[in-house]
Amino acid sequence: PGAIQIVERLVAWADVIVENNSTGTMDGLGIGWSDVRRLNSEAVMMSSQLMGSHGLQADWTGYGPTIQTAGGLSWLWAFDDGEGPPGSNAIHPDHLAGRLGAVGALAAIIGRDRGASGAHVEVAQVEALMFTLADHFLAEALEPGSVRPRGNASPDGAPWGAFPCAGEENWAVICVRDDDDWVRLRKAMGDPHWARDPLLATSIQRMEARARVENGVAEWTQTLDRAEVQDRCQAKGVPAARMMFCVDQLEDPHLIDRGFLVDLEQQALGQIVMAGPCFTGSRMGPPAIFQAPLIGEHSRRFCVQDLGMDSVLVDDLVASGALEALDELP
C-alpha cells in the first residue's frame, strides 16, 4: 500500500510517465492509463510494448533482438543461400522505439501547452521496426518475390560488404559504388590477375559474379590487418573502414577530435568514458551529462521536496520497505 501511495503522488506530480512493461502490467498495478487520467488529467503517458497494447499477439514479450524475427529484419539480413538467418544481438529496434516514443511524448506536451489535455502515446516496437523497412514491403507488393535475403550485399554495387582480415574476428568493410571504384580497388589490391578479367569490368557483371568477386577480395583482405585494408583502400579513394571494437572507439582520433567522448567521474566506479550527444546545434547548450545516482540516493529529498510528503511518513515508508533510501554515500 505504501508503494502505491508513492507512485500515485508521483503520477500526480509528473508531466510525462514512460513505461516499457509487458502488456497489462501497469493496469494490474493500478497505474494504467485510466488511473493516470484520474490522478492527473494533464499528464502524458508513453507506453511501449513489443507488439503493442492490443491485438492478437499483444501478450508477446521480448526486446530488440527478438522482435527482429517478427519484424522481418532477421530474414532480410540472412544470406540468400537457403540457410536460416545467422541471428544478431543488435538492439537497434529498442533505440527506434525509445526515440519515437520520446518524440511522441514531446509532441503531446506541446499539444497540451497549446490547450489540449493529456494524452496516451503508444509505440509498438514491431511497428517501429517495420516502418524502417517500408520500401521493401512496397517493392514486394508491387513485384512479389523481388525482395530476397541480402546478407551484406547491396543492390548498388559489388564487391560490397564486410571482409575478413588477419587475426580473429577482424573485419573491414569495403563498398565499390561504381566502375571507377572498381579500378581504384584493383590498384589497392595490386591489380591481381583475376580482377583484370574484362567480364568483371561493369557493376552489372560484378553483381552477377558477386560470389567470385568477393571471394577474390577476401583472399586479399585476409592477408592484411583491418586498419591496413582501410588505409590502402581510402588512399585510392575507395570507401572502406575497419570494424572497430569498443576499445578502438575509445582511442579513435576522429571521435576524440570532435569531442564526442566524455570523461566522467562516476561514484563507486571512478573515471569512466561516456558517449556524447548524437547531435549538436549552434544554439544549443552543452549536453547535460553527469554521474548516475546510486539507488535510493535522492529518495528522501525527492519525496519531501518535490512530492511534498511528510518526513515522518517517508521514514515509515523506508522502514516498511516500500521505499529505499541511501542515507550515507559509500
Segment roles from a protein language model:
Residues 8, 13, 21, 25-176:
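Active-site-adjacent "lid/gating" segments in soluble enzymes
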Residues 8-11, 106, 182-186, 218, ...:
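Non-transmembrane alpha-helical segments in soluble domains
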Residues 159-236, 240:
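Aromatic-enriched alpha-helical interface/lid elements that frame and gate functional surfaces
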Residues 312-330:
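Amphipathic terminal alpha-helices
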